[in-house]
């Protein structure tokens, strides 16, 4: 019987699948036999939650012919007994590049300098990161080794895309079988359109930031839907983009914040994305749930952190350690919140880690049926392929794998995988060799011999009735066994050579004796030798230490978001910035996020009373020029104008500098684009609502602003050879950039008015807003001639420059600035840090103020922003500005420059309760902010901060010690990796 079974299996493995008549010629006789097989009496997981016992599966011509009990065996059909096996539908990976790695990016022929345009031959898009015309199926070639690895982890189908660029082209749905030609493995040629926020491998200068990538993607959408083309240009990329609009869109992002950014783009164009996320969605689960968009999540959970040095506490952040503990809980949290998701193997160091990581997710709360659904039915549904894959049902591809136990039993092993009906034995799985005592029998010998076999055996001894009969050499590896008997060691001269493999508990195989006679043999397990320590480890449930999510997910975050309170400050010195001036021994009441009133001897039922005797209360500090809380680049310097990019697209609510600046009394900031080009990007106005999501930091109904720049930075004087080919290269050229764009902006306004359906140009849209007084300029500036030039350009085109920032030669042209109506946001005492500021003086702010220009002091620096109160004090030192007026330099005046003074900047009933409690005169170097409120919510408290610092150290120590124990217990670990902190300035460029 065993000979017949073994022969049947051998024949089965030699057959090929016949789907249809092939156009490819044969090299030798063709095998016309159909690949038909019956799997009997298995436990079949037809679909997640639908388990059928003692069930048969009939496979014909690569598809499932029938599923049920006692199915009649067709003539000539092979039959396999699976009575002790579990069968699962093959997994589907929706984010893979399997088989399409032969695609190559454009090789640049350009020498030094910036690469401004695509070098791809043909009528394609101007930017190499945009290649929707790429079809992954044209590059697909099956890879035997990788396919075997994927099958070994349960994957029978992948959706393969070119993982390079912003618009990556169409993805192809393929099976992980092995056939020639590879086209026979293609299930569906064009299934989805791949997108991302990463420019990929191109060395083209634009985009150089994530906000640039987002702007480029948005512009591509508008190019695709334009009803009237601006020229008769033939563009194959845009044509392909329009074709791809009928496909599913899969966008790859790298954090939960980027998920929200992707959703923002999708909503703008009425699209639904499938978002390949980063596995950190638990950090803001409510916001992710509100997007109502499906996810593809990785399970590349970080290894536990192993710490050998107490100094490691200073090298690693609390959020890093917390992520290690919480990442395995992410799939379960998503499932419990009803968020639709599928799971990808992307991001794993090795594919063989997949099942281990999946079981870890199950241990940490992911329901088993939900886990299976995330790998079968959900991905099939998301790409509209439920008729072909995802379950074990009649008519679908015969894609399923066989386990010797329930998949979620940690001791379970996969024995085989059927892909499009073809059976693949698995040779790359963890060895399931049985160590133990066996009985050896053959078809040509009636005797049964006792033998001990282990993986470490080098010799084999066959014992009959306690007497050594045969001995020889043996090798056991990956469930395969080979042994031969040495004639010299044989007592009767017999020579046997045997090969076989493990099937369940026993070994079966074929052999040949010294006479050339073939036979079958069996090694029947009598007694298994078990490694108890290994089994105990497999059975043990190792859970990550419990820890809580913080908002934001950094060390100084809160477990719960704070709320607005009714607070009465008693007996304080109030700096009103109003006609009342500075009031001593005065009370102030805030409630519902607003200033209610101030006066003497106030009382209010239910109010929290704070004794502010000897202390000062002011409106919050406003930083007119900041670069904190920005993700992935502050400059988009690849072109002379980047008016299309928006800082608001990349606001980073997790930046610890928000908290640090709250500790310095800052409550609002203008987040500015850098100064890499004459026309920069659009600003974002935020309040420092520590812990709020990015969109909730934004100040609603704030006017739009945009960054312009003059001087050394924009003409790239310090960029070296890399910056010698982008226009402009001189100060004269900078003026011509403005002349060009404003004249084009005027024409654009007229054309759009005449033809509202013409192509929308995001760059010129922003320029048009400036000309229509809907967007306002903040201009980086130093030298008086350039300052005067931009005001003249503005006068010519009938708009007003809103603010000159830095403006270190403003004292030279203060009268002209006042006449133009422009404000100044300057440094208090910066000079001599580059040549174009050679004439800077610390009296600059006072001189402009005395002439009548609205003057503010800004930071342009994450550290200086925490000391803007001291910067204001320097206006008193340099120029004798009265204290009350000097304080306005960092409160009311920046509010005026940002058009926010109706809501903030002073203590006035009805204004936002953005207030700071200071320990001393706020202009003093001894003053510290004791409490900072934004919209009446206390986001910083110096006394509570001391407690937080101690709590952070204790929590880091607790988690590290717990992980040290897990590492000692055998769990994979890695050393401490310090997190790099990036601080942006005007001239910062992403690497």
Task: Describe each PLM feature range.
Residues 30-37, 73, 426-439, 452-455, ...:
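N-terminal helix-cap/turn-to-beta initiation motif at the start of protein domains
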Residues 33, 41, 111-122, 133, ...:
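His/Asp/Glu-enriched, well-ordered alpha-helical/loop segment
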Residues 95, 441-450, 480-553:
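Beta-sheet ligand-binding and adhesion/scaffold domains
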Residues 42, 397-430, 572, 912-952:
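C-terminal cap of metal-dependent C-N hydrolases
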Residues 39-43, 428-452, 457-466, 474, ...:
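Tryptophan-anchored aromatic micro-motifs
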Residues 142-280, 413, 419, 431, ...:
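Polyanionic/metal-chelating signatures
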Residues 22-24, 29-36, 44, 48-90, ...:
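Histidine-rich, glycine-flanked metal-binding segment
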């Amino acid at each position: 019987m065993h000979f017949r079974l073994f022969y049947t299996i051998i024949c089965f493995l030699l057959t090929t699948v016949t789907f249809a008549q092939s156009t490819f010629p044969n090299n030798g006789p063709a095998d016309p036999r159909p690949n038909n097989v019956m799997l009997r009496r298995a436990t079949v997981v037809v679909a997640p939650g639908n388990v059928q016992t003692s069930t048969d599966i009939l496979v014909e011509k690569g598809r499932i012919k029938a599923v049920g009990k006692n199915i009649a065996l067709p003539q000539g059909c092979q039959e396999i007994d699976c009575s002790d096996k579990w069968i699962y539908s093959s997994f589907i990976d929706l984010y893979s590049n399997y088989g399409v790695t032969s695609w190559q990016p454009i090789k640049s022929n350009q020498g030094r300098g910036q690469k401004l345009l695509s070098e791809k031959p043909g009528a394609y898009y101007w930017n190499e990161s945009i290649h929707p015309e790429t079809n992954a199926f044209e590059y697909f070639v099956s890879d035997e080794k990788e396919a075997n690895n994927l099958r070994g982890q349960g994957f029978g189908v992948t959706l393969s895309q070119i993982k390079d660029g912003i618009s990556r082209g169409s993805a192809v749905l393929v099976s992980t079988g092995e056939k020639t030609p590879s086209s026979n493995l293609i299930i569906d040629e064009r299934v989805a359109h791949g997108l991302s926020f990463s420019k990929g491998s191109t060395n083209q200068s634009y985009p150089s930031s994530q906000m640039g990538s987002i702007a480029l993607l948005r512009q591509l959408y508008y190019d695709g839907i334009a009803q009237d083309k601006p020229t008769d240009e033939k563009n194959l990329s845009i044509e392909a983009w329009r074709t791809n609009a009928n496909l599913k869109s899969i966008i790859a992002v790298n954090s939960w914040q980027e998920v929200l950014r992707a959703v923002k783009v999708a909503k703008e164009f009425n699209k639904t994305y499938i978002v390949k996320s980063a596995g950190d969605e638990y950090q803001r689960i409510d916001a992710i749930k509100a997007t109502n968009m499906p996810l593809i999540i990785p399970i590349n959970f970080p290894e536990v952190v192993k710490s050998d040095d107490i100094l490691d506490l200073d090298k690693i952040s609390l959020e890093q350690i917390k992520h290690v503990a919480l990442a395995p809980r992410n799939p379960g949290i998503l499932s419990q919140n009803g968020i639709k998701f599928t799971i990808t193997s992307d991001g794993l160091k090795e594919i063989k880690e997949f099942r281990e990581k999946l079981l870890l997710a199950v241990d940490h709360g992911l329901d088993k049926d939900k886990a299976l659904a995330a790998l079968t039915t959900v991905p099939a549904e998301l790409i509209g392929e439920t008729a072909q894959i995802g379950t074990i049902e009649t008519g679908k591809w015969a894609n399923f794998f066989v386990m010797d136990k329930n998949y979620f039993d940690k001791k379970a092993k996969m024995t085989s995988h059927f892909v499009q009906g073809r059976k693949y034995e698995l040779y790359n799985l963890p060895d399931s060799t049985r160590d133990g005592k066996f009985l050896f029998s053959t078809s040509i010998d009636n005797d049964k011999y006792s033998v001990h076999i282990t993986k470490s055996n080098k010799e084999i001894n066959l014992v009959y009735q306690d007497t050594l009969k045969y001995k020889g050499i043996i090798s056991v590896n990956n469930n395969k066994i080979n042994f031969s008997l040495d004639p010299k060691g044989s007592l009767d001269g017999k020579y046997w050579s045997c090969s076989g493999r493990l099937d369940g508990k026993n070994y079966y195989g074929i052999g040949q004796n010294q006479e050339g006679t073939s036979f079958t043999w069996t090694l029947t397990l009598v007694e298994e030798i078990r490694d108890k320590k290994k089994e105990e480890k497999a059975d043990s449930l190792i859970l990550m230490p419990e820890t809580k999510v913080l908002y934001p997910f950094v060390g100084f975050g809160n477990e719960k978001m704070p709320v607005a309170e009714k607070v009465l400050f008693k007996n304080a010195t109030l700096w009103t910035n109003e006609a009342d001036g500075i009031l001593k021994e005065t009370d102030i009441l805030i409630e519902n996020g607003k200033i209610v009133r101030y006066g003497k001897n106030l009382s209010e039922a239910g109010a929290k009373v704070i004794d502010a005797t000897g202390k000062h209360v002011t409106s919050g500090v406003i930083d007119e020029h900041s670069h904190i809380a920005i993700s992935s680049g502050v400059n988009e310097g690849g072109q002379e104008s980047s008016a299309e990019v928006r800082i608001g697209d990349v606001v980073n609510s997790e930046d610890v500098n928000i908290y640090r600046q709250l500790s310095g009394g800052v409550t609002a900031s203008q987040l500015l684009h850098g100064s890499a080009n004459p026309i920069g990007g659009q600003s974002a106005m935020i309040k420092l609502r520590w812990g709020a999501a990015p969109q909730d930091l934004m100040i609603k109904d704030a006017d739009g602003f945009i960054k312009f720049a003059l001087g050394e930075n924009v003409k790239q004087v310090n960029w070296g050879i890399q910056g010698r080919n982008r226009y402009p290269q001189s100060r004269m050229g900078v003026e011509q950039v403005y002349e060009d764009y404003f004249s084009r902006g005027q024409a654009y306004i007229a054309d759009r008015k005449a033809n509202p359906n013409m192509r929308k140009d995001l760059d010129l849209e922003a320029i048009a807003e400036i000309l229509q007084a809907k967007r306002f300029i903040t201009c980086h500036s130093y030298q008086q001639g350039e300052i005067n030039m931009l005001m003249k350009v503005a006068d010519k085109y009938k708009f007003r420059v809103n603010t000159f920032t830095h403006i270190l030669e403003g004292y030279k042209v203060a009268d002209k600035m006042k006449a133009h109506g422009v404000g100044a946001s300057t440094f208090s005492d910066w000079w001599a840090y580059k040549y174009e500021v050679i004439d800077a003086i610390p009296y600059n702010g006072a001189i402009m103020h005395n002439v009548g220009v609205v003057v503010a002091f800004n930071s342009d620096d994450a550290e200086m922003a925490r000391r803007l109160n001291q910067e204001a004090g320097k206006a008193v030192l340099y120029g004798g500005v009265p204290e009350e007026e000097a304080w306005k330099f960092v409160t009311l005046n920046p509010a005026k420059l940002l058009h926010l003074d109706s809501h903030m900047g002073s203590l006035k009933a009805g204004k936002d309760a953005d207030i700071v409690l200071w320990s001393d005169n706020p202009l003093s170097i001894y003053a510290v902010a004791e409490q900072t409120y934004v919209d009446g919510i206390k986001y910083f408290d110096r006394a509570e901060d001391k407690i937080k610092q101690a709590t952070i150290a204790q929590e880091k120590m607790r988690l590290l010690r717990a992980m040290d124990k897990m590492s000692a217990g055998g769990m994979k670990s890695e050393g401490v990796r310090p997190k790099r902190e990036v601080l942006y300035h005007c001239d910062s460029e992403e690497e």
